[in-house]
């Protein structure tokens, strides 16, 4: 499967670069003019860092549609992406053909329609395969990521498309006569995410499907803590291997097609991302604080403060515990891997601190995993009404 997908990624990129530049030149120039007028990082409606639209990266994506070296053949152009070869740039597979017909304004509209179609489809499946309240938590979680910005930015959209597709594929096959190979599933999701990703917030494509599976395993298989923890670990490793090995494959292809000098350039960037620099030293705790602040919309000297956020969360948790009562400890412990999965964004921030502290105004969306995990965990450990339990057993 790994070799097949790498071949598909490589060939699909090479094929779209066979499209003549003359077919897309006009729409590329008009689209770039629109985004330059808007500015590199416009803030629509909310005027908060949380709602920045990353036109800077979207303009880079459009500029990359046309190779800046005339002597490159389609394979070289598709690997180089204008001397930016460390990523796959999988968005080109859709963006380059569509730009033959459409400009950026039209593609934003089509992208928004596809986003909501996949979003509501995945939410409907969650309601059908789990419980309606889980679907409500899912909708609330995704909506907290400032969708007005997400649906107008191609860089933001691609990871959500992978997430929605992963959830739809998972739940469409869950409970059927042909069970999924879940470790292969997470491996492939990691590969596909890396094909499209710019280190935007890839962890959501692991965290949200994994949380759903951990919840369903307790409900359907009466899974205990060790069983769920081992499953969580294996699934996470599978996703991580798929993500990392797809990146390694791109670097290897780059060396073969363009030369070894590009490999050393990539290694220097990786070193910078992991260790920082004198101008931008790593501040791992500060990175987490920045991303939390952006996500919770905490403003300096504003109405929302850290103390108020924590107080509201504690009061709500206490009220729910008193009102609904907790399940037995064995059941509660089986749900604990969900809480561990909810911590994945913060592990990501600690590892990828340099990137996450610079681009916190969009990497904060990785914390959607924390929100969804927290809500699903609370739902799982609280006692249910007898009518809800009977209905769930009948379903």
Model region roles, listed by residue range:
Residues 93, 139-162, 190-195:
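Aromatic- and kink-enriched transmembrane "portal" helix at the membrane-lumen/periplasm boundary
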Residues 93-111:
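Juxtamembrane segments of multi-pass membrane glycosylation machinery
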Residues 112-135:
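Transmembrane-helix motifs of polytopic, lipid-linked glycan transferases
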Residues 171-182, 215-230, 324-329, 378-395:
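Membrane-interface junctions at the ends of membrane-embedded or membrane-associated helices
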Residues 182-209, 231-245:
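Membrane-interface alpha helices of multi-pass inner-membrane proteins
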Residues 225, 319-343:
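Membrane-interface helix-loop-helix junctions at transmembrane boundaries of multi-pass membrane enzymes
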Residues 232-317:
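Membrane-lumen/periplasm interface segments of specific transmembrane helices
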Residues 358-381:
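Hydrophobic/aromatic-rich transmembrane helices and adjacent perimembrane loops
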């Amino acid at each position: 499967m790994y070799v097949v997908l790498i071949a598909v990624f490589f060939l699909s990129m090479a094929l779209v670069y066979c499209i003549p530049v003359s077919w897309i030149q006009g729409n590329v120039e008009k689209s770039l003019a629109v985004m330059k007028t808007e500015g590199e990082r416009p803030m629509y409606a909310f005027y908060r860092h949380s709602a920045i639209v990353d036109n800077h990266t979207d303009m880079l994506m459009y500029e990359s549609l046309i190779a800046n070296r005339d002597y490159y053949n389609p394979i070289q152009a598709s690997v180089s992406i204008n001397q930016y070869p460390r990523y796959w740039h999988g968005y080109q597979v859709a963006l380059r053909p569509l730009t033959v017909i459409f400009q950026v304004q039209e593609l934003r509209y089509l992208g928004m329609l596809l986003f909501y179609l996949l979003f509501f489809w995945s939410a409907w499946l969650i309601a059908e395969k789990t419980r309606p309240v889980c679907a409500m938590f899912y909708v609330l979680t995704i909506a907290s990521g400032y969708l007005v910005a997400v649906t107008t930015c191609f860089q933001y959209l691609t990871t959500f498309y992978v997430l929605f597709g992963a959830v739809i594929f998972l739940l469409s096959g869950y409970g059927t006569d042909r069970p999924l190979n879940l470790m292969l599933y997470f491996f492939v999701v990691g590969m596909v995410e890396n094909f499209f990703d710019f280190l935007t917030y890839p962890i959501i494509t692991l965290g949200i499907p994994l949380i759903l599976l951990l919840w369903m395993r307790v409900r359907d298989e009466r899974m205990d803590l060790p069983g769920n923890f081992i499953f969580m670990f294996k699934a996470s490793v599978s996703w991580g291997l798929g993500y990392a090995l797809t990146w390694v494959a791109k670097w290897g292809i780059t060396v073969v097609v363009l030369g070894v000098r590009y490999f050393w350039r990539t290694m220097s960037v990786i070193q910078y991302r992991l260790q920082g620099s004198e101008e931008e030293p790593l501040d791992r705790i500060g990175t987490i604080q920045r991303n939390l602040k952006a996500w919770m919309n905490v403003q300096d000297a504003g109405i929302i403060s850290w103390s108020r956020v924590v107080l509201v969360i504690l009061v709500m948790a206490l009220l729910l515990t008193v009102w609904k009562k907790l399940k037995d400890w064995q059941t509660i412990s089986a749900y604990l891997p969900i809480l561990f999965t909810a911590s994945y964004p913060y592990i990501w921030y600690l590892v990828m601190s340099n990137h996450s502290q610079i681009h916190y105004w969009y990497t904060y969306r990785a914390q959607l995993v924390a929100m969804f995990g927290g809500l699903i965990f609370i739902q799982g450990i609280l006692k249910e009404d007898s009518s809800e339990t009977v209905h769930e057993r009948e379903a």
